[in-house]
Amino acid sequence: HEGMGPEHSSARIERFLQMAAEDNIQILNCTTPASYFHALRRQIHRNFRKPLIIFTPKSTLRHPNNTSSIDEFTGKSSFHRIIDEDIKKTTRVIFCSGKIFYELDDYRRENKIKNVKIVRIEQLYPFPFDTLGQVVFNHKDCEMIWVQEEPKNMGPWGFVKSRIRHLFTKYKLDQKIHYVGRKRAAAPATGIAKRHNTNQTLIKQISLQAPLKRVIKERVGVSFMKF
């Protein structure tokens, strides 16, 4: 989601996820060079052939933190369906997929936020129930939020929400997954830089700093018209 013109902004990830069933395709949203490398290598060496769809926004390629060490390419390194963080005293867990991670991480560093963990879902389909389930179970007392840039009726939200809720049921957790992102819209992007940037900042502020009451209040999504 690049926030430019309506048809220049989104790869329509929600449409690919709509087609995903019965392990028919693989849908990835890689956030590191090593993740991209291992995804391609895994595809070559697998003993079966199924379509691999990878989303790679241009702005992610230019981000200074989008790097991987040599060790992440060599030895026993491999593709990780999710990328977790080792953060102590976590009170809030943010789940996201794709380039929004870097904006959230930059905002977290700038504001010295120490209690929020960001978990990246690198493989959206087949959904990583096992690895993500372990994260959910280990943080059962934390606030849990899904963050995306896309409007609420687009992006991965419609696909992931029922699957994350399934994990709550599986582990018998009295939990809810809360949404932070843009409100439902007919077009993927406003096409007006000022509105886009203001909404982008609101998404970061609400997801990382706002109390849970405000997160719940904004559950319909951030409006394109707030600027």
What positions do the PLM features span?
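Conserved thiamine diphosphate
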Residues: 1-46
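Thiamine diphosphate
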Residues: 2-12, 46-49, 61-227
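Generic detector of short, locally flexible boundary/turn motifs and exposed helical patches
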Residues: 17-21, 55-58, 109-113
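General beta-strand structural signal in soluble alpha/beta enzymes
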Residues: 27-31, 54-56, 147
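A broad, low-amplitude sensor of folded, mature protein cores
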Residues: 33, 42, 49-60
